[in-house]
Amino acid sequence: MEQVPLHCCRIEHRMDFQQSLITTVHDYSLGNLDAIDFNRELQQRPTALLIPCLMEEFKRPALSLIRDTLSKLTGLSSLVIALSAESIEDVTAAEAFFADMPFPVQVHWTNGPAVREVLSSMGSLGLDLTGPPGKGWAVWQGLGVACQQAEVIGLFDADIRTFGSGYPERMLRPLLNPSHGMAYVKAFYSRLSLETQALQGRATRLFVGPLLASLEQIFGTLPYLRYLQTFRYPLAGEFAFTRDLAMNLRIPSDWGLEMGLLSEVYRHVAPSRITQVDLGLFDHKHKSLGEKPGEGLQRMASEIFCTVLRSLMEHEGCVMSMDQLPTLEVLYRRVGEDRVRQFGLDSAINRLPYDRHGEELALHRFADLLRPSLSRLLASTIAHQLPSWSRLNSCNPSFAMDLAYAGRAGRQSPSYTPSAIRLRRPNHSPSKLQIQANSSTTSAA
C-alpha cells in the first residue's frame, strides 16, 4: 500500500459539529488561525506554558520543534520547564537551549538538591512532598512556579513530533477571554504514527474506552462515568486551566495523572465550564506494551484502572468488589474485541495499516491486569496525591516562592537553604499576623 506522508494529509471541511455534556471545539480545517491576533490576546491575560521534561528530550528533534514554534508567541508571559536532570551542567545546557526566547523562561530543576531540601522542610508539617519522582511530581512543582505570575496555565509534553502553532492557540484561546466562562481545556486529536500512519493511542482505544463502557453496564449510567466518556481522548497529556482551578487541584503522582486530574476537575468545576479542543493530527514518542505487568503500557493501564475505580468511590460511592470482577473481565474482553473490529474497519477504509493480531494481544494483556490491580486497590484505597497549592500556601505562604527560587538560583550555591532563601529574598515584608502581633505587643507595653 502506498503511504502518503502524514504531514501532507489535510482533511477539508470536517463536518463533525456534535456537542454533548462538555463543549467541544472542532477543527474545521479552514485555516483561520491568526498569530498576530493570538499574541494580542495573550497580552490581555498573563499566560504561562509548562513543559515537564527529561534531559533526554533535548537530544530529540521534537523539543527543538516545540521551542522554535513557541518562539513566535511574543505575547506569552513565561515558559516553565520542569526539568529532571542529573547535574548542574545539564540544567545550564537546558537554559542555553531556551536562551533566545522572546519571553522569560525558567528552567526549574525538579530533582535538584536545593529543591529537595525545600520540599523536605515541609515534613515537619506532616506533608511528604519528596516524590515519587515522575510526570505528576514535575507538573505539581511546575504549577507552583507558574501560578505565581500567570492567570492561565497550559501544559504540553516535550515529545510532541507534530507540534504546530495551532496547538497552543486552540488550547489557550478558550481561557483567554473570560466571557467564554471556561476554566479547563482538554485536548483531543487523531493519534497517527508519522512513520507508518497506523493508529496509536492503545491505552485509550483498547483499555480506557472498553473499561468505561463495561463499568457503565455494571453500575449503570452514573454521572461521573458519563462525564469521563464525554472526553474523546481522556489520556491526552495536553490541557490548560485558570490559576484559580490549578491552585485547588490535588495532583496524582503516578501514571494515573491524566485520569486523576479529570477526577479533580469534576470535583471543582461544573461541566459547563469545561471544553475539549481538537488539535488535529498528533504524534509523540510511543510507549511499548512492556514485557511484564509492571512495565510500559501495562503498568499505565493498571494505575489508570485503580484511579478510575477510586474516583467512582469518591464521586458515586460505588465500590467494585471481587465478586463483580468476573463480570467486568467478561464484559471488558467482549467490548474490547468489538473495538478492535471497529478500529480495523476504520483503518481499512482510510487505507491505514492495522495489526489486528497485535491489538488483540494488547487487549488480552490489559484484561489480565484487572484482577491483580483490583486486589491491590482494595488492599489500599488511598491514592498518593500531592496536596493542592492552596493548602500549601495556607501552611507556608512563602513556600511556592522558596521552591521557585530553589529550582533556579538554589542550584548554584550550597548556601541556599530554605531558611537562607527566605532571608535573602528582597523586599520581604512581614505578614499581617506579624504586624498585628507587633502592634499588640507595643500596645501592651
Say what each PLM segment does.
Residues 75-87, 106-112:
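Short beta-strand/loop segment that forms part of the nucleotide-sugar
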Residues 90-149:
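Active-site-proximal specificity loops/subdomain of glycosyltransferases
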Residues 149-161:
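Short beta-strand-to-loop acidic/aromatic patch adjacent to the donor-nucleotide binding site
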Residues 9-71:
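N-proximal low-complexity "stem/linker" segments adjacent to membrane-targeting elements
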Residues 195-205, 216-238:
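A recurrent flexible, glycine/aromatic-enriched loop bordering the glycosyltransferase active site
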Residues 253, 263-282:
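Catalytic donor-sugar/metal-binding loop of nucleotide-sugar-dependent glycosyltransferases
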Residues 163-189:
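Conserved donor-nucleotide/metal-binding helix-loop-beta segment in metal-dependent transferases, i.e.
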Residues 2, 6-27, 102, 285, ...:
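Terminal low-complexity segments of carbohydrate-biosynthetic enzymes
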